[in-house]
Regions:
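A helix-centric hydrophobic-segment signal that preferentially recognizes long
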Residues: 2-210
Length: 210
């Protein structure tokens, strides 16, 4: 009976030690930002998904815009061709969850989307030279949809930028950077806006040209 009691007591002590160790580990991880990493990682992924949804919405508008503009026989073909090519490039890129952890792939994707946005902006500016196109209700409706989508893209991108900023601050700050290093939480890439204005800026158009 004495040996059985000793064995039972030993098991209780072992359980208590294991439980205390688990609590201690949970406390350490929590104190070093593990839970916050989990929350911000999911938040940034959700924000990125919304960016992709809005980019896809814009890409889906392009075929109808192109088809409508083609009805204007005199429309500048170079401008139209650039829109078609930019859409093809942007939609051909494979975007996976790993894109968020690959700065090079992220940069290429951003550039392709910036080129599509720029090509569409140029098309809208050039369209001002064509009264028949401006009077086309179908084109007017598509233009409104496109402008609304561009606004939603801006909102989605800003939310993503903020979520990644919060995540990256945590990943680079002490002591949470130790947790990041131990568990493989790498800083995430974000939108570089330094040259985006140049990519998306519409050209100056001389409306006096025939």
């Amino acid at each position: 009976m004495v040996y059985q009691d000793t064995g039972h007591a030993g098991k209780l002590v072992a359980r208590f030690i294991s439980y205390a160790a688990a609590l201690g580990l949970a406390s350490i991880l929590s104190g070093c930002g593990y839970n916050e990493f989990q929350r911000l990682d999911e938040q940034s992924k959700a924000a990125w998904s919304e960016v992709l949804n809005q980019y896809q919405r814009r890409a889906d508008l392009v075929p109808n815009i192109v088809a409508t503009v083609k009805g204007e026989a005199a429309f500048e073909q170079d401008t139209l061709t650039k829109v078609v090519e930019a859409r093809a490039k942007a939609t051909s890129m494979q975007v996976t969850p790993e894109t968020l952890n690959n700065p090079e792939a992220f940069s290429k994707f951003q550039k392709a989307q910036g080129e599509l946005g720029g090509a569409l902006s140029r098309l809208l500016v050039v369209s001002e030279q064509y009264p028949n196109l401006k009077a086309n209700q179908g084109f007017s409706d598509l233009r409104v949809q496109l402008e609304g989508t561009e606004n939603r893209i801006t909102v989605a991108r800003n939310r993503y930028i903020q979520s990644v900023q919060d995540y990256n601050i945590l990943a680079r700050s002490f002591p949470s950077n130790l947790t990041a290093s131990a568990l493989g939480y790498q800083p995430k890439p974000t939108f570089a806006v330094a040259n985006e204005a140049a990519i998306t800026a519409p050209p100056t158009v001389d409306f006096e040209k025939k």
